[in-house]
Amino acid sequence: VKTGVSIWSSTDVLGSQCKKMLDAAAKALDVEVQYVDQGHVSEKVTASVEQLAAAGCQGIIICNSSDTEMTSAIKTCNDNKVYLAQFFRVISQENSKDIYDLATASPYYIGAVHENEPENGEKLVQILLDKGDRNIGLIGWEQGDATWLGRWEGYKAGVEKWNAEHPDDQAKLSEPQYAGTSSEGGSKAAEALMSADPTLDALIPAGGGGDPLQGAIAAVERAGKTQDIDIVSTDFLPDLGERLE
């Protein structure tokens, strides 16, 4: 049995951890695995499914970037009789009903494993609100990324809920600065947010694999604001504990 994996990167921190687990599972099950790194570039995401189907994979697991890519991915798998599942992603029944219906009607689309991103976002922003932070700067990674949009929805919901319950103690969430997935991008985004608003008291580097968080922390340190700005994130590198000591 041969399984294809369409992933943003099999070599960055999060991707390499995923690869390690998939390789261990494949070894235990005596399955061959083929990886294609697509960088969450839409054309490469859809091409990766075609490439893996052409390589003779009987099944493909994919971490796509946006729901729209799944139209092509599902069609390719239907045409080639290849099973398809998503990881870290799910098609939104609310926002992408046509694609959701296409998936549920397909005999080859078998489902998704994913986090509850809006809940993740709401809980994360609540940590800041409970600490007394009221002026929160937001750092996204890629515009339109499904996971990012889910987390952002949660941050906004958390702030709206707080403001409804605390009319005399309002919080605000900035429009996002986008960092990509690099440390440098995180650093520049944090600097832009701090210079745009000197009263900023919190930052959320929403994700992107952990490197943007490192960059944001470095920018806050350089600005001498480690006592003034709290930072929370969902994605972090394995050595973050040592980095913060």
Language-model segments: what does each one mean?
Residues 1-245:
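A residue-level marker of the well-folded mature domains of exported/periplasmic proteins
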